[in-house]
Amino acid sequence: MAKLTKDELIEAFKEMTLIELSEFVKEFEEVFEVTAAAPVAVAAAGAAGGEAAAAEEKDEFDVVLEDAGAKKIGVIKVVRELVSGLGLKEAKELVEGAPKAILEGANKDDAEAAKAKLEEAGAKVTLK
């Protein structure tokens, strides 16, 4: 197998959908027995280090779809609105694969607005 350069890998990733990239990351973590959650652990350790860190307000949120509820079609429509470039099939897979992060690293206002839209559509949502 020919060795791919970093640029070739990046170009291949650009052509993948969000769902495909998510599945790739999960498989990568399993094959190499690593986790992409290290930054979260570092942030948690930093917050435990002092009162100043605890006083800071969190400015980035992940909007996590816990359950689509009974009105799955409405939730799929809202997910397509929130995630740009997401096709119907990808949105459906994302909703059916709950719990899944819909938005990652969103500011507080966007995260709360997305949560409100999803809950209005009948979904159960958490902010992390």
UniProtKB/Swiss-Prot annotation:
GO terms for biological process: translation. Belongs to the bacterial ribosomal protein bL12 family. Keywords: Ribonucleoprotein, Ribosomal protein. Homodimer. Part of the ribosomal stalk of the 50S ribosomal subunit. Forms a multimeric L10(L12)X complex, where L10 forms an elongated spine to which 2 to 4 L12 dimers bind in a sequential fashion. Binds GTP-bound translation factors. Gene3D superfamilies: 3.30.1390.10, Single helix bin. GO terms for cellular component: cytosolic large ribosomal subunit. GO terms for molecular function: mRNA binding; structural constituent of ribosome. The keyword Disulfide bond does not apply. This is Large ribosomal subunit protein bL12. InterPro entries: Ribosomal_bL12 (IPR000206), Ribosomal_bL12_C (IPR013823), Ribosomal_bL12_C/ClpS-like (IPR014719), Ribosomal_bL12_oligo (IPR008932), Ribosomal_bL12_oligo_N_sf (IPR036235). It comes from Corynebacterium efficiens (strain DSM 44549 / YS-314 / AJ 12310 / JCM 11189 / NBRC 100395). It holds the Pfam family Ribosomal_L12. The keyword Chaperone does not apply. Forms part of the ribosomal stalk which helps the ribosome interact with GTP-bound translation factors. Is thus essential for accurate translation.
